[in-house]
Amino acid sequence: MSTILDRIKAYKLEEIAARKAERPLVAVEDAARAAPAPRGFARALSTAAATGYGLIAEIKKASPSKGLIREDFDVPALARAYEAGGATCLSVLTDGPSFQGADDFLRQAREAVKLPCLRKDFLYDTYQVAEARALGADCILIIMASVTDSQALELEAAASHWGMDVLVEVHSRDELARAEHLKSRLIGINNRNLDTFEVSLDVTRDLARRVPEDRLIVSESGLYTPEDLADLARYGARCFLIGESLMRQADVEAATRAILADPLTSQGGV
């Protein structure tokens, strides 16, 4: 039986083929070269994590498991609210079929703020990496559950070529071991199982202590309160990717500020 991730991969490969036919790689690369310089996604997170938390605040309209998350969806306004609330970076969904995202959302968000931006999508082809840079992305996502080791290496090399950072996402010990062969410093631990979309913070609790010390941990999904962040900070997570719990709030700026309140000091640990 196919999983949600299987279904996403199937339509995404069709989408990539259609985009390549519509817009040749050379045109995408020309746009990538003309894009504003990358803003330093990993550097911003590292700086923030040294004294508090690094927050990747996500602009997400919907998801396969929850359906529509936010009806009032003004991308520039949301980006500015996140920035004013203290977010370090932004994550912007560009996948349409499952998340009601769009490429233009990334452009709008980046133009509205000074924060580095992640293109949140399912990447399988280096064409998409050039596309991400053309859209203004400062970082891409590599989901280890969805790619082979050789694909991951190719995507990472392409990101490096364009001056972008890479957030390498894992959900299991096996995926973490594979991720360690990549050069990227950012390790995203997704508390959501992408096969079932079930969420458990135990995933970060288990994997964080196994991440090499030279990597920066980003805990993703299922984060709702300052206590959640403090809990996982004790296991070594200093950065967090939060979307749904902030997107559902009427006052996104206040909600962002509230979840970042009273960060656990870097001396905390288990």
Swiss-Prot record:
Catalytic activity field: 1-(2-carboxyphenylamino)-1-deoxy-D-ribulose 5-phosphate + H(+) = (1S,2R)-1-C-(indol-3-yl)glycerol 3-phosphate + CO2 + H2O
EC main group: lyase
Gene3D superfamilies linked: Aldolase class I (3.20.20.70)
UniProt EC number: 4.1.1.48
The protein's annotated pathway: Amino-acid biosynthesis; L-tryptophan biosynthesis; L-tryptophan from chorismate: step 4/5
Pfam family, one: IGPS
Keyword annotations: Amino-acid biosynthesis, Aromatic amino acid biosynthesis, Decarboxylase, Lyase, Tryptophan biosynthesis
One of the record's GO molecular function terms: phosphoribosylanthranilate isomerase activity
Similarity field: Belongs to the TrpC family.
Protein name: Indole-3-glycerol phosphate synthase
Species in which this protein is naturally found: Cereibacter sphaeroides (strain KD131 / KCTC 12085) (Rhodobacter sphaeroides)
